[in-house]
Structure formats: C-alpha cells, structure tokens
Curated annotation (Swiss-Prot):
GO terms for molecular function: ribonuclease P activity. It comes from Methanococcus maripaludis (strain DSM 14266 / JCM 13030 / NBRC 101832 / S2 / LL). This is Ribonuclease P protein component 3. Keywords: Cytoplasm, Endonuclease, Hydrolase, Nuclease, tRNA processing. Gene3D superfamilies: Metal-dependent hydrolases.
Amino acid sequence: MLEGIFDINHVFDEEGIKTLKRFGWDGSVAVQNHNEYSEEKINTAVEYGENCEFKVYSGVKISTKNQNEMEKAVKKYRNKVDILLVEGGDVKINRRVLEMNDVDILSTPELNRMDNGLDHILARLGSTNRVAVELNFGNLLKSKNYDRSKILWAFQRNLKLSKKYDTPVVISSGANDIYGIKAPGDLRGFLNTVADPLYSKKIIETTSKIIDYRLYLKNKNVLMPGLEIVEE
C-alpha cells in the first residue's frame, strides 16, 4: 500500500522536484494538459524523482467543454497515465465526469461559475464512482477580491457536500514552478480553517489513496474493480 502525502502540480524540472521533497512531500502527481501531453516529459520528471528518492506519478488534465471530446480523451489517456483529471466548470461536464469511474478527479468544479458547481446529486455520484473533487489552492491564491471570496465560498460548500455524502476530496498546490510550491503543512493549515482537523487529515491523504487504487488496477491479475484472478 502506498503511504505518504502527495501534491498535485505541474512541476517537471529537477529543481522543482527537489524543492517538493525539501518542503516535505513524499511524492507528487505531475500533470500535463491533454493537448500538450509528452511521454518524454513525464519520463524525465520520473527520472529526476528517482535520483533524489522522490516518487513522481504521471497525470493528465482534460480541458474541454465538449462532452464527446472529453469522453474520447478519457479513453485515450486512461491507460497512458496514473491519474486522470478533468477540468470542470460546465455543469454538464461536472455531472458526466462524476458518473465516470475511469476519471480520478473532477478539477475545479466551480471554475468560472457563480455557484460551487456541485449539488447533493452530483456529490452522491462522486461518492458512488470514486471520483474526487479538487480544491486547487493555487487558483485561490492567484484570485483577487470578489473572485477569491467566491472560490473560498465554493470550497466551503463543496467540502460540506462531500463530507455529508462521503465524496473523495483532494487538495492541490497547482504549482507551475518552484514559486508556487507549498509545504504540506501550509495546505493542511488552510484546510483547518475551512474544515475540522480530522477531515483535513483525510483530505491531505486522499491523493495517495487514489494513486494506490490506480496502481492496484494495473496489476495483471485484476480484471476489473473487485474482480481479480487468485493463483492457488
């Protein structure tokens, strides 16, 4: 079983990976946009991680408002990367993503919305299909004035729904470079201001559980979730 705390970010360079380790992370999910996916780029990042005993896993974020394009991209990248995210915001995309157990994380469901992007029905779907909801701390930091308060309200609302319906939640730094990297304690401290400490601990550990689940499904003896070949 995979243990530790893992960040979700867009950091691929050697200095950034060393900074993540120095800040106290056990590993990270390095995420590329699906339109810019490069196997060489992620392999290089994984190698940087191995050189400093830091675990780097591959991720792709699918960003499109077209549902058919999104579903095609999910099929294309599901077996190429460890973690699959889909950018939310559009209510139809939010719902469809939470119906798909091939997707790991619904990223920023509140993006460009006046509401939080989720309701009790969608939260239940996420719980049923093991699709996590992302709190992107980087987006919160980069926003200003009313936009920041709106995102913070969306976080609080989505946390309330997710806790009630046992929907997985992850928090990410969303860092693009060393200047956006945050220590685990910083993210945990923020979570403690919007949720109780036990729930905050659960959230900070969820990313590693998602990675562990996907690694389990890649085992050759696993035919599908809950069904595997047992050798006598």
